[in-house]
């Protein structure tokens, strides 16, 4: 079984974890037809993508 030779410091632990934070979604697009907000390159909740109806509900 592997055993560490030196204990990692709090600083090294923090540096390793520095990229683990979650970021907020900043790039929301507005659909031309319905004016609804959605993630880029995704359809809206009512089935529109780039002004066209792609899924019939």
From Swiss-Prot:
UniProt keyword annotation of Nucleotide-binding present: no
InterPro entries tied to this protein: Ribosomal_bL32, Ribosomal_bL32_bact, Ribosomal_zn-bd
BP GO terms, sorted: translation
Keyword annotations: Ribonucleoprotein, Ribosomal protein
Superkingdom of origin: Bacteria
PANTHER family (UniProt xref): 50S RIBOSOMAL PROTEIN L32, LARGE RIBOSOMAL SUBUNIT PROTEIN BL32
Positions of the UniProt region annotated as Disordered: 1-37
Molecular function (Gene Ontology), one example: structural constituent of ribosome
Coiled coil (residue ranges): none
HAMAP family reported for this sequence: Ribosomal_bL32
Gene this chain is encoded by: rpmF
UniProt name for this protein: Large ribosomal subunit protein bL32
Listed Pfam families: Ribosomal_L32p
Keyword Ribonucleoprotein attributed: yes
Sequence similarity: Belongs to the bacterial ribosomal protein bL32 family.
Cellular component GO terms held in the UniProt record: large ribosomal subunit
Organism: Klebsiella pneumoniae subsp. pneumoniae (strain ATCC 700721 / MGH 78578)
